[in-house]
Amino acid sequence: MGRLISRGGTVAIGGLILLVAALPLFWAVLNSLKHLLDIVTPTPRFLFVPTLANYRQVLSSPEVMIGLGNSIAIVGASVALGALLGVPAAYAIARYPVRGKRDIQFFLLSLRFLPPVAIAVPLIAIWVDLGLYDTKLSMIVTYLLVTLSTITWLSIPVFRRLPREIEEAAALDGYGPYAVFWHIALPVCANTLLGGVVFSFVLVWNELMIALALTSSRSATLPVVASAFTSLGQEVPWGVINASTVLLALPPLVFVGMLSRLLNSMVKGK
């Protein structure tokens, strides 16, 4: 009986958390299908005539397509480089006697301490001096600082929890340090490491402040383009804003689904 109550409480708490997390997205989807008059009514309307005009207005804007392409290129490159550099670095910190290990970990964590407002002006000055302002390269390097620190920090405890006996057994079979990492540690920890990669992707995909400061038109990301819809005319186009929010949330969901399927196929293949 006690176990049933405990399980029921866990399910209830999990359901409540899921409801709180999904409610904003559900509300955005609902409002994106409404006319403006249905959105601004004092009493929320759940019965209305749906319309796709908001999505048509968003998708008909060439800036949205350019922003989507910029976001995919910039975020994809920064996350891929962050994972390629951060995961091996985390394994080295977790498994080998690296000098200044604690200082390195504190430095990685300190990169998340500073708010974007504090570093926006120095970053603008640096990229303007280098002639790289409003370029994809400057955004990739800037976001790489976020993804690299996040993935490395989250991956260190994952490798520390890996039993050393597994690696020692592989070493006895003739595996070198690199082979132990690529063929043993990485496949075993892949499911957990995926969480850090997805988290860093969501962080930089939704980032607005730095993108707003470091881009103007050529390299503007999708959040920057979506924020411009708030200044269309004298009335706030809530339907268009909600439609752009829904479209902004779709790529991370697709990314998570594709990465999960790829990981599952790799695990089954082994």
Residue ranges and their predicted role:
Residues 6-270:
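A structural signal for multi-pass alpha-helical bundles of membrane permease subunits
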Residues 1-4:
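Short, Lys/Arg-rich, polar N-terminal cytosolic tail immediately upstream
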